[in-house]
């Protein structure tokens, strides 16, 4: 059994939340049933998917909530799903579960923004605690989603050369250094920088760094 139960059902305080939805994606039906039963036991709504494709087909209609995601699935890994959501500009807290103690994979998932990473077997109370943490973060992430989409659209409006110049700007290169790297004139670099700032709707390099930092997951 992948869930460790404890006497008195520790951590099962009922959550009176009618708006949030906990999405669960796992190719093992037994896992889906066990996790959905656990989540429903604290009064939360659940939506289950037996494949990554089925879940991604629902993207665009995601309610405020969180995603419990299996790492290893046949057609698409959990990390691939996480990456795809970032590309789509969808912001939802993710909790990963895995049948294998893969530390590098866990580190990669957390760095990409996951809330937590559990290796089976794990304690019910730990998962429920992670869900509570995720639900506290969910409203802000949901609110930020349209902004991420707009920023991504602005970035994609940059020409290939402007994206190259942007890369050097973010690395702290001076105009002269960027010109040498790209074999163009310093005046041309200045024109590209001006266009980048205009398209990204920022007025300073500091703001440019800030908005591209917000976009880093979507641009991987």
From Swiss-Prot:
ATP-binding listed as a keyword: no
Domain HTH luxR-type, first and last residues per copy: 151-216
One protein family per Pfam: GerE
Entry-annotated residues carrying 4-aspartylphosphate: 70
Coiled coil stretches, renumbered: none
GO molecular function: DNA binding
The protein's name: Response regulator protein TmoT
Species in which this protein is naturally found: Ectopseudomonas mendocina
Name of the encoding gene: tmoT
């Amino acid at each position: 059994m992948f869930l460790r139960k404890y006497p008195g059902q520790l951590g099962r305080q009922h959550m009176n939340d009618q708006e949030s939805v906990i999405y669960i994606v796992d190719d093992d039906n037994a896992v889906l049933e066990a996790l959905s039963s656990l989540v429903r036991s604290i009064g939360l709504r659940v939506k289950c998917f037996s494949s990554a494709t089925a879940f991604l087909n629902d993207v665009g209609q995601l309610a405020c909530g969180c995603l419990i995601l299996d790492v290893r699935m046949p057609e698409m890994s959990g990390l691939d799903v996480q990456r795809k959501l970032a590309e789509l500009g969808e912001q939802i807290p993710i909790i990963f579960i895995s049948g294998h103690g893969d530390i590098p994979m866990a580190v990669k998932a957390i760095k990409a923004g996951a809330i937590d990473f559990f290796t089976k077997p794990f304690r019910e109370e730990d998962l429920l605690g992670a869900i509570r943490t995720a639900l506290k973060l969910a409203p802000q992430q949901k609110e930020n989603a349209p902004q991420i989409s707009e920023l991504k659209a602005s970035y994609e409006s940059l020409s290939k050369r402007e994206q190259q110049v942007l890369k050097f700007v973010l690395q702290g290169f001076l105009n002269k250094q960027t010109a040498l790297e790209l074999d163009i004139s310093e005046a041309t670099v200045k024109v590209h920088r001006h266009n980048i700032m205009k398209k990204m709707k920022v007025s300073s390099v500091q703001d440019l760094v800030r908005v591209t930092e917000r976009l880093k997951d979507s641009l991987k």
